[in-house]
Amino acid sequence: MTDFDSIWRTQDEIRTVVNAVLGECIWNLSYNERRMAIELELTKYLEEEEVDMLINQFPVTAEYDGIGSKGTKFVFYM
């Protein structure tokens, strides 16, 4: 069973980190039920060092998920 309250809280924590570190640049932040993960796509493309730095700021484990149509993508497995 999906715990939507936990998902929403985690999304809020992710949004807070992104806004604090990069400013408002979230294109998409949503839960993918098939992957059982939160997916994040930014509106900008980050360099490798920036990706590593941002990943270290998140309160939950994050993985680089490649390049999307709008920017860098990350995934957070629940």
Over which residues does each language-model region extend?
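Short, low-order "capping/linker" segments at domain edges
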Residues: 74-78
